[in-house]
Amino acid sequence: MCIRDSAMAAKFSGMDDERGFIMLHVDINQHSPELVGSVFDFIESKETKGVNNSLRKCLSAMKKINERRQIMWQASRWKHYNDFRVFIMGIKGNDEIFGDGVVYEGVSEEPKKYRGQTGAQDNIIPLMDIFSGIINNYPKNELTHYLKDLRSYRPKCIQNFLEDVRLFFTTSNNSILNQIKANKNFRSLEILLELLEEIYLFRNGHWQFVQRYIMQNTLYPKATGGTPIISWIPNQINAVLKTMQELSLIHISEPTRLLSI
């Protein structure tokens, strides 16, 4: 897939910067099948070699995603973000703009409040959060509540899929960490730390986009999904760092037997 050959079926401003911004998100998702496949491979793996290969496959997909993510700087110029950002701003969470909500003529006389388009509604990082165990370190605060609310906008089948994956990996015997400890699999620990680093790089890269595209372009402190810009992504980055710290403290005795697997 080439982003230059992609076009939008529906558009707002019609500018190249809007097309680049939207279609790069589509471009990134071309690697989602490999990501999802690696999770299923892990679930089905019964031996150490299969577990490690599935983690390598997942790591490879995340590296490709991070490589494509960096194209954003060329795909959509930051100074032009506000030219189309206004069209994807949500109602919910932006009470300063919409007050009591918006009445959709011909649909309902009751004002509605919906959140706007946001990367938090994507499935790449949420799946990785569940798979890697980051979800266990989500802070119990209002920002995490926002995250869960945003995810309720997904198609029901995707919500069910992520919930099934969550239920599987939150069972103690199935969690990656517990499998690593039980099997004394040092190589899995090493690959998982690399995977967490890629998730961190993705979120940190997103944070850099937010600072450049939004914070330098407007004084309005809310993201399109209605979340507070300054604290939203750092909240998620901290969950990644806490998970990495937990892994770094794991001591596995006699790991050398598995180093070459």
Predicted features, each with a name:
Residues 1-3, 250-261:
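Single conserved hydrophobic/aromatic residue that forms the stacking wall/gate
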Residues 6-22, 37-45:
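Short, charged/polar, low-complexity loop and linker segments
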Residues 12, 20-24, 28, 84, ...:
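Long, contiguous hydrophobic alpha-helical segments, chiefly transmembrane helices and signal peptides
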Residues 15-33, 49-52, 56, 111-122, ...:
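Short, solvent-exposed segments of well-ordered alpha helices
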Residues 28, 35-38, 42, 51, ...:
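Amphipathic alpha-helices that form helix-helix packing interfaces
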Residues 127-248:
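Extended, compositionally biased non-globular segments
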